[in-house]
């Protein structure tokens, strides 16, 4: 049994669990802070589906940066009339991806579906109503039911353009560090699903004890709750 939580001052390693290209950007930021990085993704992103007709859409909704990348992959070039549509991004990283893709009218929420829905409701109240449906570019997995939050406020058409497939195993370098010095490892976590998938990897690798030693740094309360439920003892919101 762990007597107390590991101290942040003991952290040497940061395990980056995001898929590329997010992993590379995060790793660079972590190294700039003086920590060592070990890569071990929990998911890989696969493109799928087709983009529906965009004419008549009143706006676009992205609940991850991967949604932005998926749309760009399918369209190759974002048409000018699409680039100027209102874009609702779940958080800053997704908003930055939309900006980099060429979208010019971006509203960012605070990292969860609830605040995203609140931003859309506020615009609906200002406008009176939207001129057409909102296209939600999404993956096969949903963190929340956006359409239910916006019932009677806006029509949301969900378009699945990517799938975040689980990676079954920890990378060998990550496993070695977890087995030798897990209390010196911090792990940024960005979604409830990522927390669950990472815990599954720990179990499959036979390093269950590390669940009580590593420090998960969670994007939100929802992520922290999922991490705690999955067995991580020292999850913190960062």
Labelled PLM ranges:
Residues 1-238:
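Signature of uroporphyrinogen-III synthase
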